[in-house]
Amino acid sequence: MTELARLKFYATQPHSCSYLPEEQATTLFLDPSQPMDVHVYADLSEMGFRRSGDHLYRPHCQNCNACVPARIPAARFIPNRQQRRILKRNADLTVTAARPAFKEEYFELYRRYIETRHADGDMYPPSRDQFSTFLVRDLPFCWFYEFRLEGRLMAVAVCDLLPNGLSAVYTFYEPDEERRSLGRFAILWQITEALRQNLEAVYLGYWIKNCKKMNYKTQYRPIELLINQRWVTLN
């Protein structure tokens, strides 16, 4: 483990929670002057930290522990019948790794996705500046995985390639292709990619029991949840 005791962290003032509107949230950030070292990042991911733009963070709420870090142990994952159907349905897609960059093709897909699927969220309305600040970061471990159908961009999975796993930062996809379940397929593909690269896990971010938008995460079994500073398996 990295000497994490040397690192500095800062907590925000209480603010409205993005997931549970009736709650006040506090967020703990790694000192932004600390270089974004991949090994520090990997160690912090084991402790439930995530990346957004140039920042590593985790929830640090005084009276709530609803945000539970979740990861899929790649070698032990077994797809269920529905997931096997999703894999088969998307077997015609090709996946290519690209460096993070701003492209109108990316932004137009992102814009349609946010406007269709998340018009009630804090990422609406989408803008080019927001897209760039959130996702287009020049970090050596960050990759854009493009999912295409005969050249047409169907989805982009933004992932961080860490020594201990793939961290699923964000996925946006064609909202008109609902039958394909592209968001779920992107996770299934990332599990396969983690196995191919001999990585232990796919980090999914936070699972929140009372947030319907998070329910899909526990459909991947087994899944591991960080509870009381220990990763606990949910079969």
UniProtKB/Swiss-Prot annotation:
Keyword field contains Ribosomal protein: no
Pfam families per the UniProt record, alphabetical: ATE_C, ATE_N
SUPFAM superfamilies attached to this UniProt entry: Acyl-CoA N-acyltransferases (Nat)
GO process terms (BP): ubiquitin-dependent protein catabolic process via the N-end rule pathway
UniProt-annotated location(s): Cytoplasm
Main enzyme class: transferase
Catalytic activity: N-terminal L-glutamyl-[protein] + L-leucyl-tRNA(Leu) = N-terminal L-leucyl-L-glutamyl-[protein] + tRNA(Leu) + H(+); N-terminal L-aspartyl-[protein] + L-leucyl-tRNA(Leu) = N-terminal L-leucyl-L-aspartyl-[protein] + tRNA(Leu) + H(+)
Keyword tags: Acyltransferase, Cytoplasm, Transferase
Major subcellular location class: cytoplasm
EC number in record: 2.3.2.29
Single annotated GO MF: leucyl-tRNA--protein transferase activity
One GO CC term on file: cytoplasm
Keyword Chloroplast: no
Purpose of the protein: Functions in the N-end rule pathway of protein degradation where it conjugates Leu from its aminoacyl-tRNA to the N-termini of proteins containing an N-terminal aspartate or glutamate.
HAMAP family named among the record's database cross-references: Bpt
Family label: Belongs to the R-transferase family. Bpt subfamily.
Protein name: Aspartate/glutamate leucyltransferase
Source organism per UniProt: Pseudomonas putida (strain ATCC 47054 / DSM 6125 / CFBP 8728 / NCIMB 11950 / KT2440)
Gene behind this protein: bpt
